Curated annotation (Swiss-Prot):
Protein's recorded name: Transmembrane protein I329L
Free-text function comment from the UniProt entry: Viral TLR3 homolog that probably prevents TLR3 dimerization and subsequent induction of IFN. Inhibits dsRNA-stimulated activation of NF-kB and IRF3.
Record organism: African swine fever virus (isolate Tick/Malawi/Lil 20-1/1983)
Coarse class of the protein's main subcellular location: host cell
Domain notes: Contains putative leucine-rich repeats (LRR) and a C-terminus cysteine-rich capping motif similar to domain structure of host TLR3.
Assigned keywords, A-Z: Disulfide bond, Glycoprotein, Host endoplasmic reticulum, Host Golgi apparatus, Host membrane, Host-virus interaction, Inhibition of host innate immune response by virus, Inhibition of host TLR pathway by virus, Late protein, Leucine-rich repeat, Membrane, Signal, Transmembrane, Transmembrane helix, Viral immunoevasion
Positions bearing carbohydrate: N32, N39, N44, N76, N82, N101, N185, N219
Location relative to the cell: Host endoplasmic reticulum membrane; Host Golgi apparatus membrane
InterPro entries: LRR_dom_sf (IPR032675)
Stated family: Belongs to the asfivirus I329L family.
Ranges of the Extracellular topological domain: 32-239
Topological domain spans for side Cytoplasmic: 261-329
Disulfide bridge partners, by residue number: C195-C237
Length: 329
């Protein structure tokens, strides 16, 4: 009986070793800031993500989470997806799905992408073009608990991390893998390195020098990325800048015209007030004719005798004017 029992124990353990653990995955679709649960199709170890006929037309985000999958990739899982659908999402979360290559979903990164969570997968390299897209869009990205390796293909990532470290990189010590994180406001990028005995900062400097020495053609990738990002950002503002400059020029010209008009008006009034012309006050019993004469003393007395009932036009002398002024005082 003991031998039979031992035989069945070994047989059961052998069968258990051959049976793959049950993989349970679920994904959620975000619509109107609410996450709705859907079923995930798994065919021959392949996650069909998402189920095309069950996604709302106004979906804004997708989240896929798998369980019973070792994030160090003992399970060989691949992902199939619909790129045209993923491009419409602002929020993409594929967690613990055993993804080996980010290019499997990078084709679905559209301009609307505002958040990316790829934790607990088996990513080994971050492709340069994908990193460039994430940097330009300033997309908050979670990459920790992956298996990112050393080598030429990750050199742009080292440059990027080292450049960020100058201002806001925080190093967290780990016993096994070096965890390197940087944070900038709401943007986070966590990176696990599976090689090197040095602390995170020293390793980044060492690896960056290695990349610069062995692969000088990648030496300015991050600077180029940031420059292109700023250039593209400012290109969108060019029409507004031109309109602002034009409006400023018109306003400045209008102010100059108003200022010149006020100066001219003030100058002409001042000149008129300082004039040496002597105007004769009107006396009710007389009418003076000043036609074609600037000075009343030289005015010619007009003859109105030919006209009936015409008043006599008389030019008073200087003494009479003085006497008239004294009487008025």
């Amino acid at each position: 009986m003991l031998r039979v029992f031992i035989f069945f124990v070994f047989l059961g353990s052998g069968l258990a070793g051959r049976i793959k653990p049950q993989i349970t995955c679920k994904y959620f679709i975000s619509e109107n800031n609410t996450w709705y649960k859907y079923n995930v199709t798994i065919l021959n170890g392949t996650i069909v993500l998402p189920a095309y006929n069950m996604i709302p037309t106004k979906a804004a985000g997708i989240s896929c989470t798998c369980h019973d999958i070792d994030y160090l990739q003992k399970n060989n899982i691949s992902i199939h997806y619909n790129t045209s659908i993923l491009k419409t999402f602002q929020d993409i979360r594929i967690i613990r799905c055993g993804m080996k290559n980010i290019s499997e979903i990078a084709g679905g990164f559209g301009k609307e992408l505002k958040f990316l969570d790829l934790r607990y997968n088996n990513l080994q390299f971050i492709d340069y073009n994908i990193l460039r897209k994430l940097i330009r869009s300033n997309t908050p990205t979670y990459l920790y608990y992956n298996n990112l390796m050393c080598g030429k293909r990750n050199c742009p990532l080292y440059y990027f991390l080292l450049k960020q470290e100058q201002t806001y990189l925080k190093l967290l010590p780990q016993f096994f893998l070096r965890r390197i994180s940087f944070s900038n406001n709401n943007t986070y990028l966590y990176h696990f390195l599976s090689c090197g005995n040095k602390p995170g900062h020293e390793f980044l400097e060492y690896q960056t020098k290695y990349c610069r020495t062995k692969f000088p053609e990648i030496n300015i990738t991050v600077n180029q990325l940031i420059t292109k990002k700023n250039t593209e950002r400012y290109k969108n503002c060019y029409p507004f800048v031109l309109v602002s400059i034009l409006c400023s020029c018109i306003s400045f010209l209008f102010l100059i015209i108003c200022l010149l008009r006020s100066i001219c008006k003030k100058y002409s009034c001042t000149k008129q007030g300082k004039s040496t012309h002597k105007y004769i006050p009107l006396i009710p019993s007389y009418t003076f004719s000043l036609k074609k004469h600037r000075h009343p003393e030289t005015a010619v007395v007009e003859d109105h005798t030919t006209t009936a009932n015409s008043p006599i036009v008389y030019i008073p002398t200087t003494e009479e004017k003085k006497a008239s002024c004294s009487r008025r005082k």
